[in-house]
Amino acid sequence: MKRKLLAATLTAAMVLSLAACGGSSSSSSSGTAASCSGASGSGELQVNIWDNNQLAGLQQIADEWTEESGVKVKINVVDWDNYWTLLEAGASGGQMPDVFWMHSNTAQMYMENDLLLNLDDYIAKDDAIDLANYYEGVVELYNRDDNGSQYALPKDHDTIALLYNKAIFDKYGVEYPTDDWTWEDVRDAAAKITEAGKADGVYGYAINTSNNQDGWYNIIYDYGGQVITDDHKGTTIGSDEAKAGMEMLRQILEVAAPQTVVAETGTDSLFNSGLTAMITQGSWMINTFYKAEHHDDYAWAMLPYADVNGNGQCDKGERYSAYNGLGWAAAANTADPDAAYSLISYFCSEKAQKEQAALGVTMAGMKGVSEDFANAFEGMDVSAFTRAEEEGDLFFRPYTRNTTVWEDALQQNGGFLDAWLNPSDPAVMAKACDNAQKIIEDAIAAE
């Protein structure tokens, strides 16, 4: 009975936003149900991930561990949606992979249902792992609320930046974005390009409003609002501050690619096709644009800021970037828990974390070892991502015990859907913020 209830619970929790740290654009469909088989009987650890861009680098690191341990590692890439479907199937009575990525949307559910290996005893005996050396938000995320135990170690963290196409700016005579830009500057530049590019079908800006982490969450925090409060028990999304941020977003949406166009094509495809001049994206997607045909035309800037103080400069608290972090977790029923933890420990060791950054896989989950990440993409300056945490402010991607309940509701009728599709009316956006306040409060109360 518990497993049937678990299956239903996880099914509800698996409708995940593609915005969340490594969505579908960079994933592969090479995974199958067979890839979920564990070490039992195979003599090797089965590892599941969802981002094909990271496969080569992570397999290289895993092979180094194999040389030390003698245990083989097979990393399987499963596309984002099937990843969670297969993991759910394993959790509900099948066989889960030995080691796999865990995510903020589902972590508490998997931990509370005893599906993940408790790492406390291993960490206590492991001289290579000191949780104080990792980003606090990522550590906290994979710490179970009701018993304080740790069920995953931080794999990485990420930040958000503004990506722009220099060729489009040149064509329409608009100056390039800089780190001094405000959101008003983005709006004004987008308006100029969208107007000038009408005959060519080119837009100045594109945002997928279903993508929150690399999209509209950031502007709310810039203006002083919070999607979820720091204690994970409330929200200020209906406050005057949050409404000011969403009003600025509304003004940008008025001059950006319509959501009907974005829904059909996607922001990344629009950008790589030369049909939009600006998007915001996460550090986990750099490789996609670095390998694109016209990557020489691409450049990154820090996210714009909100000049709330009106003094013409970016003060503390006016430029935020969301950050998130995946966790390396092991199945509670893995046939070889010692080997599974040993691999996780190696992935999260200082040596491997530095290597991960230097290879351009992702920014490290360990603090202070991502210096080489900014130099991993020859010819493309990606320092905007590391400078986001050095010169700006970070907030951890908002989550509660059952994040997907309110995240999904915010995208529907009664949430922000009407505001996304009809950005010309300020009252619609303001009302959506009020609705969102109640949606989130009600969802938290029901958790």
Show where each model-derived region lies.
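Glycine-centered hinge/linker elements that transmit conformational signals in sensory
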Residues: 189-192, 231-261
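Short, well-ordered beta-strand elements
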Residues: 33-36, 41-52, 71-76, 98-99, ...
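Extracytoplasmic "Venus flytrap"/periplasmic binding protein-like
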Residues: 61-134, 170-175, 270, 277-278, ...
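Hinge/lid segment of periplasmic solute-binding proteins
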Residues: 34-38, 105-159, 299-301, 377-378
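Short, low-complexity disordered leader/linker segments with a strong preference
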Residues: 1-45, 67, 434, 438-447
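Long, aromatic- and glycine/proline-rich binding clefts that accommodate carbohydrate-like moieties
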Residues: 358-411, 415
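Extracytoplasmic/periplasmic substrate-recognition and gating elements
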Residues: 63, 68, 72, 148, ...
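A structural signal for short loop-to-beta-strand junctions that line the ligand-binding cleft
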Residues: 90, 97-98, 128-168, 314-321, ...
